[in-house]
Design a protein with these regions (language model features):
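Metal-coordinating catalytic core of metallo-dependent amide/deamination hydrolases
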Residues: 1-115, 127, 133-135
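Active-site-adjacent C-terminal substructures of enzyme catalytic domains
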Residues: 18, 109-186
Length: 186
């Protein structure tokens, strides 16, 4: 995908950029991402952590089956994969810090996705992550605003009248001055 974007970019009418949404538990990807950042191949870098929701979905047969299907693994192999990834959770903070250093050195803007506490937002800000993408509650959005961070919410949230997850309503955040970017979505 990245190679195709780079190949086609000069021919495209729109200013096309590469936004990498990195799942923080994908620790094995760190060396490659660091190289891409160093090489100037990433234009925007986001930290995503969906591990808790992945683990919670294991107890929901429909969601679990959908995840297993997407991987192409057997149910047993999928369970082993999730367990192996979860046990490496203690490595995530250091990996995030190294990637933040690499992104800062490369001049790449960073986003944190689904910040769920003001403390989480402050921790990401301390690493140079100046964009809060879809903060999950008003307190966290307010922390982002008070810290001078950009705050992103999704336009589908506005159109639907609320978040598909049941979290923060973007229209409420906009009305309170707690949204600086409205994204069309991915």
């Amino acid at each position: 995908l990245l190679e195709n974007i780079e190949l086609l970019r000069p021919k495209l009418a729109a200013d096309t950029r590469f936004h990498l949404r990195h799942e923080t538990y994908n620790l094995d990807a760190e060396p490659e991402i660091t190289q891409w950042l160093s090489d100037g191949r990433i234009d925007l870098f986001a930290y995503n952590d969906h591990m808790d929701s992945t683990v919670a979905s294991l107890a929901k047969p429909l969601k679990r089956n959908r995840m297993v299907e997407r991987t192409g693994l057997t149910s047993e192999a999928f369970d082993q994969l999730v367990q192996r990834i979860v046990t490496r959770g203690h490595e995530v903070p250091a990996s995030n810090a190294r990637l933040a250093e690499a992104a800062c050195a490369a001049g790449v803007r960073m986003l944190s996705h689904d910040d769920n506490t003001p403390a989480m937002r402050r921790a990401f800000r301390a690493q140079g992550v100046g964009i809060s993408e879809f903060p999950v509650n008003e307190e966290t959005a307010r922390e982002a605003a008070e810290g001078g961070d950009f705050i992103v919410f999704g336009a589908p949230n506005v159109v639907r009248g609320g978040s598909h997850t049941g979290w923060t309503r973007a229209s409420d955040m906009i009305a309170k001055g707690l949204c600086s970017v409205l994204a069309s979505d991915y």
